[in-house]
Amino acid sequence: MGRKVTVATCALNQWALDFEGNLQRILKSIEIAKNRGARYRLGPELEICGYGCWDHYYESDTLLHSFQVLAALLESPVTQDIICDVGMPVMHRNVRYNCRVIFLSRKILLIRPKMALANEGNYRELRWFTPWSRSRHTEEYLLPRMIQDLTKQETAPFGDAVLATWDTCIGSEICEELWTPHSPHIDMGLDGVEIITNASGSHHVLRKANTRVDLVTMATSKNGGIYLLANQKGCDGDRLYYDGCAMIAMNGSVFAQGSQFSLDDVEVLTATLDLEDVRSYRAEISSRNLAASRASPYPRVKVDFALSCHEDLLAPVSEPIEWKYHSPEEEISLGPACWLWDFLRRSQQGGFLLPLSGGVDSAATACLVYSMCCQVCKSVRSGNQEVLADVRTIVNQISYTPQDPRDLCGHILTTCYMASKNSSQETCTRARELAQQIGSHHISLNIDPAVKAVTGIFSLVTGKSPLFAAHGGSSRENLALQNVQARIRMVLAYLFAQLSLWSRGIRGGLLVLGSANVDESLLGYLTKYDCSSADINPIGGISKTDLRAFVQFCIERFQLTALQSIISAPVTAELEPLADGQVSQTDEEDMGMTYAELSVYGKLRKVAKMGPYSMFCKLLGMWRHVCTPRQVADKVKWFFTKHSMNRHKMTTLTPAYHAENYSPEDNRFDLRPFLYNTSWPWQFRCIENQVLQLERAAPQSLDGVD
């Protein structure tokens, strides 16, 4: 009997409800796996329908079309003589489950339902699915007639079981189950399962990749075994970017690593591994073997098939590798860029329009589009015909081939500097120079006539003319005049997005890009329905601190020297009158806090789940060397006052790339009221009482320094 097995896992760029495209990508991955000698192919979670179907899971159509795709897979000659493990929703006894359907040569071997559902952060699986709660139990599932006709089976095993082939034993866990305190792979490994598979639908978060890798390597380090992880990749229809990172590990080491960010729709990993390495590794772990001797057995589905060959002694085996991680700046450069590409090609639009202000945020967004163009050109040079076909569709030129990123950027990105009498010459110059370096089609215009027309209507109706504070107006007048400028920019952005290509004799429209960062959204430091209102926002989940580091990275990686003056300039909205031609307004002065402080507040509020009093107590220790308790209290109260006053703005926030775990995104991730008692009387009184106690107890030690 052979001892070496070749197994395959993959990362697929599936699209919610794109059953035709999803089927073709699944078939392509199986074909690649077979051509590389694999006898087992694992695919991502819910790959048949696409993970992000959300409330479409309620529809019987989604179940029907998933089984139709399964029938097409069973019928295809590509799926013969290889165990195929695919993901789809299945209804059993009127209960909907998130399942793996494992089949071999037109026979369904096992339908394995997910036992631990993801229901935190962006995940809402309990809304659509029920976890299978009967450990080590199977039932007979009555197959649809379209499947019966192909498999000649009336039923198939449904439940928590493992596959026993001639030469090994294979068990399955699904995404979230790896993250639970008592993952199924533990008990399966103790029961002699040698190959564990994990089909995931895991999305990108900055600095998260190491957690996923650590979980897999630790699982196989403690218990031995081979571990395959598959994942979806790309944007499948909303704010999330699924970041691939398919992998194959054994006995605590990684043997194959998939890309985290890629424009390839299908990526297949294979490895040839020796089962005897698993057995000898386990044999010397006495604590593991004692536990295994008492382990409860899993139901075994016998499979008349082997993953190994009889004559495999000379077959080379895969060698362990070191996992290569991206820096946070590289993650920002690549993740949102790939997300933008998927959104652009699947929206059937002709490119992007970006209001380019000459500041860090819009410059970072421009850099992401340029990074996207770099990735596209790289894929085209490597021979990716699908990417080239998408490029030609977008620019509406059947023979076009991008020569370099600047060339492509000129075809798909229009940047627009919208000046007013409050704009400085410096920001105009910075925007123009950056546009020249990245190659975008750049427009400069002046919004003053539109502002004058709108405020003129108000004056005509009311007989009142509002003034800026610098000219003697009240704070209410000052804010209203700032907001008029910001909102007119949004109207003009959409006008130019719809008609700028038409004016140049080019078909199609443009997607409007927003540039509000996660910190500004958290505080509400933006005008509702201004240029933060757009079609999509690639930086809306990224902190100001990370964006500044990313812009510095772009200076070096892409030689965009125009960014140097942008990153060194004061951060300002330029909505108030200039003082002697110079900026008189800065963001941090307007906010009453620094961006660094704002990031801290955001992480404590969302990630650490703190209200005002808990945050105050936490920051007393964190900032004890720089702030007195009174100063900490004032800062915390100011943050929560501003956050709650502006919480309503989150309900209309532009869909943004999800990158940070403290995002205030209202759609699914951060669910809170938008009408608050903004004075927080009870909470702030608790803070005030604590400050008074501290001041009475040790006034001399509360100076904020050592």
Curated annotation (Swiss-Prot):
The gene is NADSYN1. It is an enzyme of class 6 (ligase). ATP binds at P355, L356, S357, G358, G359, V360, D361, S362. One of its GO terms (molecular function) is NAD+ synthase (glutamine-hydrolyzing) activity. The active site is at E45, K114, C175, S357. It catalyses: deamido-NAD(+) + L-glutamine + ATP + H2O = L-glutamate + AMP + diphosphate + NAD(+) + H(+). Its EC number is 6.3.5.1. Signal peptide: none annotated. GO terms for biological process: 'de novo' NAD biosynthetic process from L-tryptophan. Keywords: ATP-binding, Ligase, NAD, Nucleotide-binding. The keyword NAD applies. One of its GO terms (cellular component) is cytoplasm. It comes from the Eukaryota. In the C-terminal section; belongs to the NAD synthetase family. Catalyzes the final step of the nicotinamide adenine dinucleotide (NAD) de novo synthesis pathway, the ATP-dependent amidation of deamido-NAD using L-glutamine as a nitrogen source. Homohexamer. InterPro entries: C-N_Hydrolase (IPR003010), C-N_Hydrolase_sf (IPR036526), Gln-dep_NAD_synthase (IPR014445), NAD/GMP_synthase (IPR022310), NAD_synthase (IPR003694), Rossmann-like_a/b/a_fold (IPR014729). This is Glutamine-dependent NAD(+) synthetase. Pfam families: CN_hydrolase, NAD_synthase. Pathway: Cofactor biosynthesis; NAD(+) biosynthesis; NAD(+) from deamido-NAD(+) (L-Gln route): step 1/1. Residues 325-706 are annotated as: Ligase. Residues 5-275 form the CN hydrolase domain.
